[in-house]
Design a protein with these regions (language model features):
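Conserved N-terminal catalytic/coupling substructures associated with nucleotide/phosphate chemistry
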Residues: 1-114
Length: 114
């Protein structure tokens, strides 16, 4: 995902104030979310996959809170993806907005043709 598209998604989230079947929001203000594995599994088993955006606090009116440490968060996301069978290979993107970092993990859908 390009930086421009990521920033557009952040703006869209502020307008819609909701998740969708292919978009999950996680706050990640102090650490990597504990229930990430379930979301990774769910998105990887959908035809279209999905996007997880970290740094949005949906419990606090979808406030753009940013993530605790973008580098460490990416490492922990990849570690959880490597534990899955089959292994999930996310495309990770980091953007900065209003001096806060946000991370997007694009999770590819399953390829049933294999």
């Amino acid at each position: 995902m390009t930086t421009e598209i990521f920033l557009e998604k952040l703006n869209e989230i502020q307008k819609l104030k909701c998740e969708t079947q292919t978009l999950e929001l996680k706050s990640a203000g102090v650490d990597c979310p504990k229930r990430l594995y379930d979301t990774l599994s769910s998105f990887s088993n959908q035809d279209d996959g999905g996007i997880i955006i970290f740094g949005i606090d949906e419990k606090n009116d979808y406030r753009e809170s940013g993530v605790y440490d973008a580098q460490d968060l990416q490492k922990k996301i990849n570690e959880q993806c490597l534990q899955m069978e089959p292994v999930v290979r996310p495309l990770l993107t980091v953007v900065e907005k209003n001096q806060k970092s946000f991370v997007a993990a694009e999770i590819p859908g399953i390829d049933y043709r294999r």
